[in-house]
Design a protein with these regions (language model features):
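A residue-level detector for the "anchor" residue at the start of short, highly conserved motifs
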Residues: 1-164
């Protein structure tokens, strides 16, 4: 089930953060003084207020996501070959961490898919009801293999489901 965490301290401009199962979010003790940066492993939903002097950046192993005042979802599990970023509202800038660096900007109802093996980012239209279904406790599968369905069920419920 989704976990909504309350984070202490002065986080002006960082309104909401919700973490999905098997996810972690870290930040430095001086968050917000000069920079607003967090590190994410797993899946999280953010609502962030725009601040041009202190951009909000989500770092993952492969991508940096600069928030330009927005709400968005990031799916970045280490075991998965594809990362996904879905924009609910506002605007985000996505930049690869590898060289040569590539940049894409998302508009609402778009999502970026980053293939970790090829390093290719693609952008496509999406229905954000599906992208944020986990926030409501729902699981949605479309054209998904049985092994991927079982992997998500295992993650969600913290169980092992045998499959051959």
């Amino acid at each position: 089930m989704p976990i909504e965490g309350k984070i202490g301290g002065d986080f002006t401009g960082w309104n909401t953060s919700k973490l999905n199962a098997e996810s972690s979010l870290s930040y430095t003790h001086d968050f917000g003084r000069e920079l607003r940066q967090v590190n994410l492993e797993g899946e999280a939903y953010f609502e962030v207020t725009r601040n041009e002097d202190k951009p909000f950046v989500v770092h993952t192993k492969y991508l940096d996501i600069e928030v330009l005042g927005t709400s968005f979802n990031v799916y970045s599990y280490e075991r998965e070959n594809v990362m996904e970023m879905a924009l609910i509202s506002g605007r985000i800038k996505i930049q690869t961490c590898s060289e040569p660096s590539r940049v894409v900007y998302l508009k609402p109802n778009e999502k970026a898919l980053f293939n970790k093996e090829s390093g290719i980012i693609t952008v496509e239209k999406t229905d954000n009801r599906f992208e944020t279904a986990w926030l409501r406790g729902d699981l949605v599968f479309r054209s998904t293999t049985l092994s991927d369905v079982l992997a998500k069920l295992e993650r969600r419920y913290g169980v092992n489901i045998p499959f051959e």
